[in-house]
Amino acid sequence: ERLLFARARMALSWAVAALGLWPGDVVLVPAYVTGSAVAPLLWAGLQLQPYAVNPATLEPHWPMLSVMARAARPRALLLVHYFGFPSDPNAARAFCDRHGLLLLEDCAHSLLTRHGGHPWGSHGDAAFYSLRKLLPLPDGGLLRLRFAGPGRLLPPPLQTSAAALLPLLLRQAAQALGCRPALRRAAAIRPVVADEVRLSEPARGIHPWSLRLLRRLALPAARERRRANYRELSQRLAEVPGI
């Protein structure tokens, strides 16, 4: 089952409901993670138990997780594939099967990553991806479910208003025109009253504009372009002292 959303975190919200996670259920999450990545779990009333990751490899600390799985009685494990580099999904799948947990794969940066002929996210009970972070789209998130219960999972409500894309389009335009640093400086002088993550966020489908663009994209070419950009950046950073 695959569904398209406006944001990857909306896909995670949908997965929480589809997999039958309830308020009060415990989810093991990495201690190294952004607030927006786990916000849907908090919105659903789930209890988050952070686990350590190896600072060198960013792989989960499996011995610690084994202790936590016995003590906290969790329902699910969130596995993050950081920066497009995959964590070991085979180890995660085996761990979850051994302890009777659902496996949620955060593939926000791993949309175009494959291993052994399969895309990352194939091992989890649910995997969510960010389209707009890796492709030239105004919005877009993808949910892949191995099992969604009886019957087909209902798609999210469509968004058709152009106003829904306006903030993203303005931000992308500012970046293209070189105005992003000035905007950040202007925002820095305003008092911070809340995190960027809202108290709740209703799930909505990908915008039709983004969907039309997505259907026109050559994904293999986009993957190779991303890899070429990474190699170029890595080579240039290698020449910078202290990095």
Question: Whereabouts are the PLM-identified features?
Answer:
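Short loop-beta-helix segment that forms the pyridoxal 5′-phosphate
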Residues: 1-15, 29-31, 51
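PLP-dependent aminotransferase-like
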Residues: 17-107, 111
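Active-site PLP-lysine loop of aminotransferase-like
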Residues: 83, 126-139, 153-167
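Short active-site oxyanion
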Residues: 2, 23-26, 219-220
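PLP-dependent aminotransferase class I/II
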Residues: 33, 78, 150-243
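Conserved active-site segment immediately N-terminal to the catalytic lysine
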Residues: 105-137, 142-144
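Conserved PLP-enzyme active-site core in the AAT-like
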Residues: 67-73, 90, 115, 126, ...
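A generic structural signal for well-ordered alpha-helical segments
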Residues: 41, 96, 120-121, 237
